[in-house]
Amino acid sequence: MSQFTLLGFIALGGAFGACSRYLISELCVVLLGRGFPYGTLTVNVIGSLLMGILMSSLNQGLIEAGPWRPIIGLGFLGALTTFSTFSMDNVILMQHGEFIKAGLNILLNVALSITACFIGYQLMMKS
């Protein structure tokens, strides 16, 4: 596959990831409200779980590496998850004096995302 074609597939994966992030975030607002950045937390945890599954699957040889790592890992998951929005969410919370919510958001994003990635990786390990 040419680099140009691969870039096109990565961009397509990114488009699906960005649209997924938007839809998941909007669903979180509808279900949980705007009092906490649930959407960012949700996409980061889901993306981390999927990254663990992807990387374990690749490392175990369950799927052939080929273009899947950059298409899914860089494109889809790169656009689905978001560190910049996570950062801005915390700045906004702190600007509004919501320091406990900001701390909780930081703790939950880091702890749950790493845990989800670990779980995803372990799920795909060969027994």
Curated annotation (Swiss-Prot):
Reaction it catalyzes: fluoride(in) = fluoride(out)
Pfam family, one: CRCB
Leader sequence residues: none
Record key words, sorted: Cell inner membrane, Cell membrane, Ion channel, Ion transport, Membrane, Metal-binding, Sodium, Transmembrane, Transmembrane helix, Transport
GO biological process, one term: cellular detoxification of fluoride
This protein's GO CC annotations: plasma membrane
Regulation of this protein's activity per its record: Na(+) is not transported, but it plays an essential structural role and its presence is essential for fluoride channel function.
Predominant subcellular localization, coarse grouping: membrane
Membrane spanning residue stretches: 4-24, 35-55, 71-91, 99-119
Membrane topology designation: Multi-pass membrane protein
Molecular-function GO term, any one: metal ion binding
Binding residues for Na(+): G78, T81
Subcellular location: Cell inner membrane
Function recorded in the entry: Fluoride-specific ion channel. Important for reducing fluoride concentration in the cell, thus reducing its toxicity.
NCBIfam families: crcB (TIGR00494), PRK14200.1 (NF010796)
Protein family: Belongs to the fluoride channel Fluc/FEX (TC 1.A.43) family.
Annotated protein name in UniProt: Fluoride-specific ion channel FluC
Gene source species: Photobacterium profundum (strain SS9)
Organism ancestry: Bacteria, Pseudomonadati, Pseudomonadota, Gammaproteobacteria, Vibrionales
